[in-house]
Amino acid sequence: MTTRPNKENRNSVRHGFPRDLIVFLTIAFVITAGIGMAAQVPQAGAERRVTHRPIESFTLVDQNGAHFDLEKLTGKVVVVAFAYTTCVDVCPLITAALRQTQIGLGKEERTRVQLLTITTDPEIDSPKVLKAYGKRYGAEFNNWAFLTGSSAVLGRVWKNFGVGIKHRGRGLVDHTPLTAIVDEKRLMRFVYVGPSPDPHAVLDDVHSLLKHQS
């Protein structure tokens, strides 16, 4: 991940590392997430999957240095993406897609939907670094938190969501390019695996869960 992708691989899911590692991370996700997935539909550079997986509660630290408890979001739809701030290829696409998702939410919907970006590189991604990263993408922090924490706690979170991680050196991390949608009961309902989830498709899934709440 030390160089930007060329024209031939800009839209691939290689994430700047060997194809065999992509296969490994994808298999790791499928095994971790369980066999109960169905309705796999390609979506603008990311594969959409339907699931029904419980997400364990966790407490991390947000971009302001405050403790952030997932349990407090019970009752809300939560869109979760995994990225790290020094990534130069896939993570910017994932974060930009999440920003477009935020823009697509109405005023009332923003009170019912929370966006989360969880780092895959806590060694570098301090709260201050994450806040600057969010600002760079125009994030509105009222319903979008950027989270870090200890490697031990984050390791459990990554595993729970099915995110494979391989640290290759300082500032270099290979990870499953994953965006997940969690419902109001903390069940992961939709997963997008790939570098560029379609914001319109993500919004459609969010709206379907909000409608189910009504």
Annotate each PLM feature:
Residues R168-S214:
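Thiol-/selenol-based redox modules, centered on thioredoxin-like
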Residues V77, Y84, Q102-E109, Y137, ...:
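Sec/Tat-exported extracytoplasmic proteins
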Residues E71-I94, L98:
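Short active-site neighborhood of thiol/selenol oxidoreductases, capturing the structured segment around
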Residues T95-V157:
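Structural microenvironment flanking redox-active thiols in thiol-disulfide oxidoreductases
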Residues I55-E56, V77-V78, T176-L178:
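Short loop/turn microsegments at loop-to-beta-strand junctions
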Residues N143-W144, G155, F161-R168, V173-A180:
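Structural micro-motif
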Residues M1-S57, V61, H212-S214:
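N-terminal targeting signals for export/organelle localization
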